[in-house]
């Protein structure tokens, strides 16, 4: 039997992970773990790949296996915290971030992760308190500035929010998250034209930037330009090669609903239901029921002129995650 070169296999797994080939990466990390059952770094990377596929339960299992071997790993604790937060288990996520920060009092990832979880719990003041602590460690850290900007955005302090996004741009004028954040803020202020200019700026930086196409599609929906929005979502699909991404498919399903393409919308919501766990899964289930109801109304000529927003339509345009 040929002995596997663990380092080479792990490196190849990381390359596959970076390329978005998550299933192939998971298999490569499995090969590493089969050769060395204590390869906790491979378990961590495997968990990250599962997270990217929205398989949060599998991801947490991988992180727990890694932590059983290396319980002090700040990286694994932070990854587990992010995954739990994505799963909607915010208190459990905060516990992971607190443990990570206790192990490393300079972990900005832990503080930002905790702040984002608090945002989702609508605890914005507490989130700002955590981010203030992060600023004491590094006042120019881009992710911290983005997190503060998003928190202020949630508090409807739009001018202050934009000022923090601009602080990020002062250090990196090509930061697409900051441009997206400013665009989202303008959209929340009702200035769709300024929002579109920001998102177009992103495409001038990188025409393949997925979030920009999704954001433009979202604004077009707000402007009732549903056919233009659909073109944006189709472009985004082409960029990812049809690979599932929640924000993309949620926006696509919403747009198809507004265009009265109910059968297509239902199929997309079914894909979301099959791909997700937790709140997103049940939101998709409610949306399927909602669109079926609209379909029945259409059949008897009782469909409203303007389709109302579906239960699961994602209005959270956060850029800090």
Q: Where are the regions that the model predicts?
A:
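Register position in tetratricopeptide repeats
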Residues: 18-19, 52, 86, 120-121, ...
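Structural marker of alpha-solenoid helical repeat scaffolds
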Residues: 35, 69, 103, 137, ...
């Amino acid at each position: 039997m040929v002995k596997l070169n663990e380092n080479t296999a792990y490196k190849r797994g990381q390359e596959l992970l970076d390329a978005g080939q998550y299933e192939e990466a998971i298999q490569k990390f499995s090969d590493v773990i089969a050769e060395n059952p204590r390869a906790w770094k491979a378990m961590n990377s495997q968990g990250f790949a599962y997270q990217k596929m929205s398989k949060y339960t599998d991801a947490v299992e991988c992180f727990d296996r890694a932590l059983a071997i290396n319980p002090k790993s700040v990286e694994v604790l932070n990854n587990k915290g992010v995954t739990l937060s994505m799963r909607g288990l915010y208190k459990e996520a905060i516990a992971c971030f607190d443990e990570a920060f206790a192990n490393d009092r300079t972990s900005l990832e832990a503080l930002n992760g905790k702040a984002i979880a608090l945002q989702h719990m609508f605890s914005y003041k507490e989130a700002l308190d955590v981010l203030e602590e992060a600023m004491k460690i590094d006042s120019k850290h881009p992710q911290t500035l983005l997190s503060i900007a998003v928190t202020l955005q949630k508090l409807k302090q739009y001018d202050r929010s934009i000022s923090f996004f601009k602080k990020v741009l002062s250090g990196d004028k090509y930061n697409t998250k900051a441009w997206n954040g400013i665009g989202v803020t303008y959209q929340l202020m009702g200035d769709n034209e300024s929002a579109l200019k920001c998102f177009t700026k992103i495409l001038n930086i990188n025409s393949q930037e997925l979030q920009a196409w999704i954001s433009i599609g979202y604004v077009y929906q707000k402007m009732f330009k549903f056919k233009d929005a659909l073109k944006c979502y189709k472009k985004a699909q082409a960029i990812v090669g049809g690979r599932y991404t929640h924000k993309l498919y949620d926006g696509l399903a919403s747009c198809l609903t507004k265009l009265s393409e109910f059968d297509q919308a239902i199929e997309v919501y079914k894909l979301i239901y099959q791909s997700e766990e937790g709140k997103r899964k049940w939101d998709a289930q409610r949306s399927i029921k909602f669109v079926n109801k609209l379909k029945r109304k259409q059949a008897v000529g009782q469909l409203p002129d303007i389709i109302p927003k579906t239960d699961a339509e994602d209005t959270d345009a956060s850029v800090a995650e």
